[in-house]
Amino acid sequence: RALASFTQYLDPALVLAYHTQGQLIYWNFDDIEVSGALALGREFARLSGYSLENTPYASGFAGYKDWFIKAFRRPGFTIEAGLGENPLPLEQFDTIYANNLGILTTAALGLPE
């Protein structure tokens, strides 16, 4: 509830939900295709080198990104950073940071109106 309330207060243009398995990006939820989300997801994939994937049905319905897309009808992304078993080794930090810096910068600069 706290995260939902905080998100409603901030009213963000998009959200990034970070997880740590797979070096991929999930961009959609339950047949809801938000305007501009696919193009932005493709840009995030290009910047990070991660693959862009549809959210698997079995993985949907429980995440922050899924709730955000449904509630706000705005772009939301789950970024699966890193490889291996959790907890990921600290040695992956520099690579994960380098792979995600472009995503973070692009998201922070905002969406074109």
Say what each PLM segment does:
Residues 1-113:
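Metallocarboxypeptidase
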